[in-house]
A protein has these predicted regions:
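Short, surface-exposed ligand-recognition loops at beta-strand->loop->(often short) alpha-helix junctions
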Residues: 6-19
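Enrichment for repetitive, rod-forming helical segments
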Residues: 11-12, 46, 56, 79
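Short, well-ordered beta-strand segments in beta-rich or mixed alpha/beta enzyme
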Residues: 1-6, 36-64, 101-102
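An amphipathic, aromatic/His-enriched active-site/gating alpha helix that lines ligand/cofactor pockets
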Residues: 21-34, 52-87
Length: 115
């Protein structure tokens, strides 16, 4: 699911923080397997919230649940309406594995003798 939020002028930082702290994590309590929040670098008021649900029923339980009703009421006036959301089917995704910080790094090169 993609939710296209648009913060009102001067409210971008406050609003994206509210999504990150309240709205996005609540989705996991309704069966979401993952969420992501993106903010446009070209337009700081444009915020994309992505949520991975297996069923639309779980999505609607989340969207109409008490946490999201509270979120929309608390942040009323800090985002533009209408709020648009669109169900997407994921067809492909891949990630490169990240190197763990606890792995030993390669040894430092030792200068050759006599130089």
């Amino acid at each position: 699911m993609h939710i296209q939020w648009y913060a009102t002028v001067g409210r971008g930082d406050m609003f994206v923080d509210g999504i990150v702290r309240m709205a996005a994590p609540a989705a996991l309590d309704y069966g979401a397997t993952r969420y992501a929040v993106h903010r446009s670098r070209d337009d700081q008021y444009r915020i994309l919230q992505q949520i991975w649900f297996d069923s639309k029923d779980d999505w609607y339980r989340y969207w109409e649940g008490p946490e999201m009703r509270e979120f929309r009421a608390r942040f009323s006036g800090k985002y533009q309406v209408p709020i648009t959301y669109v169900w997407h089917d994921e067809y492909a995704a891949e990630e490169l594995p990240r190197e763990a910080d606890d792995q030993p790094s390669a040894p430092e090169p030792v200068p050759a003798a006599g130089r």
